[in-house]
Amino acid sequence: MHFLFFVLIVIFNASATPDAIYGQDNRQDVYAVSNPLFINLAKTTAAMIERTKIKDIGNSSVFSGTPLKDMFKLCPDQRFRNQPSAANCSGTLVADDIIMTAAHCYDLAKSICKNYVWVFDFKVLHEDQASVTVSNDNIYECSEVILKEMNIKVGIDHALIKLKRKVTDRSYAKLRSKRTLELNSPLVLIGHPSGLPTKIADDAYVLKILENSYVTNLDAFSINSGSGVFNAETGDLEGILSSGRADYDGKGNCTSVKTYVMEEGNETVVDVRLVKEFLSQYKK
């Protein structure tokens, strides 16, 4: 995968890391998932959304965004085509006031904390929902970037963002402890592919382990950058998505999701151990 600016609609798209589908498309909306572990883990995901895309209606705000079908000129048979693409990156709550995301999300734009907010429960109730309403209590401003390290060539691409107030209505993600990451470990990805409302994608596993990251066959897309990658059995946070293969393939006048076989997985996940020591010291 390569880094790519989508300039069709917005000036900045921090998810500049396109990805793809491996085997069957396993992306699901939260309402369509029955696994209680996955539903609970989805509460830790947050969407980084530009303030200009928010319409305050009192105690809640409406996020409309651009329909996915217009953003990428999708073919009529493509999934989620009517849902809004509003997010610019994904993030995962790793402390009561700290979000972990990809460092490149904070490398592509200035004044991030001034122009963007982090939104929890950015999700739909049915597949063709064209806008999303979220309680203002679940919209958080950031105060500062407390850690940012990026060297894509060696698999380093992570940042920790401090929020202005603590998140008190949900638990943060449990980081993998002493257990060593193993090949074929089952994984689930939770975030905002193509800027969409929260999607859960499982039925993936670890293909290769590198020094600072690992390679998987997760069904991921641009703007999944920073999405939490969890162990599908224990629920532990294994890392965050950084990069992968190209996600869309042109077919004449429209585009479709690009599909690969499972063994061709090339989605890079930054290992959560790179931030564990910093977090433990910071929270003291």
Task: Specify the residue positions occupied by each region the protein language model found.
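Sec-dependent N-terminal signal peptides
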Residues: 3-12
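Short beta->alpha transition motifs characteristic of CBS
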Residues: 102-106, 191-194, 222, 239-247
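C-terminal cap/linker of serine protease catalytic domains
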Residues: 124-125, 132, 137-141, 168, ...
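N-terminal signal peptide
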Residues: 14-16
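Serine endopeptidase catalytic core focused on the charge-relay Asp
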Residues: 18-33, 40-80, 84-86, 94-96, ...
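Catalytic nucleophile loop of clan PA
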Residues: 92-93, 220-242
